[in-house]
Amino acid sequence: MAQAKIIYDLVGGTDFSRAAPNIEGTALAVNCFTESNTEGDNKNVRTFLQSAPGVKYFDTFGQTDHCDGLYVPSTGLSAYDFEQCLFVAYNGEVFRVDSALNHEKIGIYALGNTVQFAESGGERAILMWVDGTDIHGYNLKTGETVNITLPKRIDAQNQYIQPTHIAVVDGSIVLNDKGSSFTYYSIKYPLNTAKRKVFKIVNGKVQYESDKITVSMTEVDSGVYCFLDDYGVQKYFNGSTSSDKCVAISSVGPLLTLFGPSSIEFWQKGNTESYQSWQRTSYTINKEQGLESPYSIASVNHQQFCIGTGKANAKCVLMIAGTEVRKISPLWLDRVLADNDVKSVVGWTYSKNNHSFYLFSIKNKCYVYDATTSQWHIRQSRNYYTGTVKNYMPLFAVWWNNRIITGSSESGHLYELDENYFYEDFDSENRLPLLRVRQTPVVTTNYKPFVIYELAIECNTGAMENYDRPAKALLEVSRDGGYTFGNVLESSCGRRGQYSYRLKWLNLGMNRQCVLRISYSEPTDFVMSDSEIRFKELSTPL
């Protein structure tokens, strides 16, 4: 006779299907993710589930709309000792924020569009941003506006390109053109000086000095000539093996990635011309997978992430490391992508404590990939007045003044992601404790009926700030594979200082299969490291 063995997983990621949860997966991790203590030599690996960071109010620009972009450049105003500032795109305006949280409007963008930032590099550091209609510039050291002239379309008469993405590789500024297959680029460091000397051209011919040897030069505005070489000719290229549109570009190190609806190409600088041309790297064309969501591209730790599409995997999430393109989304997430229009989805990333996260939202869920553990989890916020779940409030993230600062998906607020803060702030006054939920896969024991006498969880207890009441966790049990759940059962996590307390529930009834869902919304950390189920297998069928 086989030994009675119960199979369950209380510490893990998300693997959830609404279509057939009892067959395809019921596991959920909401506002919590898997961690392993692997530091030190000869240390046993122990996996546990820890809380996602709290959402702490930081600053505000308004109560409506949402953030359209964040950026922290490498330098700042010379008058303030080159202090790094935060740049925020909100409600059609771009603001510079200093360490004292003073706001200064420094530019505009097309209202309602997502903003992509880049920095020119070189001695004259210029912050640039594109919005799908135009390009804008700002001198980071002097605080002056820099006017930059867009290239004209190669395939149309007297029309300027409409860049949605911008990248800088080895000093060369690169733009895509919405609706076109062409990519436009500059010479190296074209904005390094306010004025630039170029060849004097009259009626298409280079002019010479009186000695008939020395080429005549003329001085021009570097912003006007940004995307022209010394002959006044535009620099551009298009896909060498694909004819689809270039809907986005991205750069990681020396590699430039071009994304089309049905292809991904990798380009790098060549040395065949005086200003270096671009050439497609060999063996790197991917014609079976393209880009579904132009603004889903985000990078962290030399890895790129995006929502792709194509005959290889249909709609899916892709991770690009170097020139390797790999699908990372599980089947349940592929179905979510397939069932929704995701063309306007925005992706963003951040990294903390050896974890690199890629995040994007669809409806009221934010799907998060942890590149360290290769697991997915979900992040959600709550409505302050009703307590019902809604989309995750943070959007975009930057590292500024030793903080992870984010924008907001529903207002002009800025937040800090703080791992030692266990609330969600809605503004400077209103907040709710962070809700964390862990739902197990289907629990079975040799696929026979069983009775659960006790569920005990090893977690941090005695962590409440006040002595007046204990922290409480809530348990719900589903006996139909995760479709519906029964009554809510409370259990104590101990009062302040009761560190030896154990979280447990007794007499959970008879089951053929069940799903356990634990919720915790106290303003303390909640870390689950292990669990135990005391049960008895039955011979009587249900």
Question: Model-derived features: where do they sit?
Answer:
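Beta-propeller and closely related beta-pinwheel folds
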Residues: 61-66, 103, 107-113, 145-346
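Acidic surface patches and DE-rich sequence motifs
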Residues: 89, 98, 131, 139, ...
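Assembly/interface hotspot detector across virion components, adhesins/toxins, and nucleic-acid enzymes
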Residues: 79, 87, 95-97, 128, ...
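Short, glycine/charged-enriched secondary-structure capping and boundary segments
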Residues: 143-144, 183, 188-190, 414-415, ...
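Beta-sheet repeat architectures centered on beta-propellers
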Residues: 1-122, 288-303, 309-542
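Hydrophobic or amphipathic alpha-helical targeting/insertion segments
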Residues: 116-151
